[in-house]
Amino acid sequence: MGCIKSKRKDNLNDDEVDSKTQPVRNTDRTIYVRDPTSNKQQRPVPEFHLLPGQRFQTKDPEEQGDIVVALYPYDGIHPDDLSFKKGEKMKVLEEHGEWWKAKSLSSKREGFIPSNYVAKVNTLETEEWFFKDITRKDAERQLLAPGNSAGAFLIRESETLKGSFSLSVRDYDPMHGDVIKHYKIRSLDNGGYYISPRITFPCISDMIKHYQKQSDGLCRRLEKACISPKPQKPWDKDAWEIPRESIKLVKKLGAGQFGEVWMGYYNNSTKVAVKTLKPGTMSVQAFLEEANLMKTLQHDKLVRLYAVVTKEEPIYIITEFMAKGSLLDFLKSDEGGKVLLPKLIDFSAQIAEGMAYIERKNYIHRDLRAANVLVSESLMCKIADFGLARVIEDNEYTAREGAKFPIKWTAPEAINFGCFTIKSDVWSFGILLYEIVTYGKIPYPGRTNADVMSALSQGYRMPRMENCPDELYDIMKMCWKEKAEERPTFDYLQSVLDDFYTATEGQYQQQP
């Protein structure tokens, strides 16, 4: 629809797979068609279902024997899964991406385990206070999440110096409230560690124990490790086009112009969100082509697309479940109405981070607004419905003056010429900032779509809202530049919003 200046891979010939020729994984319940979009190694199937020439990559004998310990309990959902309890030790037999084959040292049973539920013994990953692959900004978000209090802490890997670590601690400041302090952990040539050169430790575990007894120069004594949410089970890689009967719709969460959203369960075990599309909303073929692209976009700030049901209408889109629902509904709720401005800015930064990833992938969202951002239990934001707008066939939507088209969120060049680019997404992000800072109010209050189109053509922009800082309004105005090429990148927007409160978000502390 219109001109698309961002590069796209509309020709999927290299990745297209005829599902009829693909091997399937039989279970006692149904048949699953393998995900045709995944370039990762598939979760292995029994040997009699392997492709010709395909074999398990078994470890060499001298490499065998990696022992892992369970960080969380796991109840198997497939006949070939290995269930285990927290703390149970297992021997890894084969590694296959997100699913590993392992043998329990206690029960002697073998089966497949989710690799993100375990950690190798005698490594930092077994410690509840160690957070692997987490940025400094996300460390702050985790520590400020509900359930943590002053003294909560975590150890993370340094983003800038490979092999180094940092300590992040939640503190309380009467002037600024809850703040996060960061300390660099320095290493000695002999393998020891220290924060202050006055006292060194042979290992990080000993360092933690010391600072749990006394602050000794830190902002406060370390208390409880930061709460770590249980990770999502890896999705069954064989399940892309899944049977409708494998999905149980449990609770209706909302309804929109093109369908409904439900909380449901996949195979009675995995909680998911299910978007059901009204018949005729889009062609199955066009949707599947777009879904093939959507499936490859995986980032912490994007809602993950798991599977689809397309053999007959209504189409089901299966995604990860987000407990707090849409950002729009959350902002209008009693809980959301109590969120203070710094957290609202953080919501904006998280969304900018997700959009910066979409920008790097040369993709376009086309319908960025608070209704299409979801919120987790720990108040993490994730972008949803990216790319779906491209394949909607409803006349009231495809006609840009139609009643269903989101005029108030759409850039002038997209309204007038159908020219959707990542820069038209930047315009929409500016409107989304208005939604956030006004706790979910409709943009251009009191104006009709026709009024808005006319006003924009004459250079009108929404004025600054009463509780909106000048610096944030300046960002909005940058997003609403008439010339698309003059609008900022999402990478720039993320950096500005991440550091919006640099005066109060603690920099690295001096050595105590």
Curated annotation (Swiss-Prot):
Detected in bone marrow-derived monocytes and macrophages (at protein level). Expressed predominantly in B-lymphoid and myeloid cells. It is an enzyme of class 2 (transferase). Subject to autoinhibition, mediated by intramolecular interactions between the SH2 domain and the C-terminal phosphotyrosine. Phosphorylation at Tyr-397 is required for optimal activity. Phosphorylated by CSK at Tyr-508; phosphorylation at Tyr-508 inhibits kinase activity. Kinase activity is modulated by dephosphorylation by PTPRC/CD45. Inhibited by dasatinib, PP2, and SU6656. It comes from the Eukaryota. This is Tyrosine-protein kinase Lyn. Residues 129-226 form the SH2 domain. The modification Phosphoserine is found at S19, S228. Residues 63-123 form the SH3 domain. Interacts with TEC. Interacts (via SH2 domain) with FLT3 (tyrosine phosphorylated). Interacts with LIME1 and with CD79A upon activation of the B-cell antigen receptor. Interacts with the B-cell receptor complex. Interacts with phosphorylated THEMIS2. Interacts with EPOR. Interacts with MS4A2/FCER1B. Interaction (via the SH2 and SH3 domains) with MUC1 is stimulated by IL7 and the subsequent phosphorylation increases the binding between MUC1 and CTNNB1/beta-catenin. Interacts with ADAM15. Interacts with NDFIP2 and more weakly with NDFIP1. Interacts with FASLG. Interacts with KIT. GO terms for biological process: adaptive immune response; autophagy; B cell homeostasis; B cell receptor signaling pathway; C-X-C chemokine receptor CXCR4 signaling pathway; cell morphogenesis; cellular response to heat; cellular response to retinoic acid. It comes from Mus musculus (Mouse). The protein kinase domain plays an important role in its localization in the cell membrane. ATP binds at L253, G254, A255, G256, Q257, F258, G259, E260, V261, K275. Its main location: membrane. Keywords: Adaptive immunity, ATP-binding, Cell membrane, Cytoplasm, Golgi apparatus, Immunity, Inflammatory response, Innate immunity, Kinase, Lipoprotein, Membrane, Myristate, Nucleotide-binding, Nucleus, Palmitate, Phosphoprotein, Proto-oncogene, SH2 domain, SH3 domain, Transferase, Tyrosine-protein kinase, Ubl conjugation. The gene is Lyn.
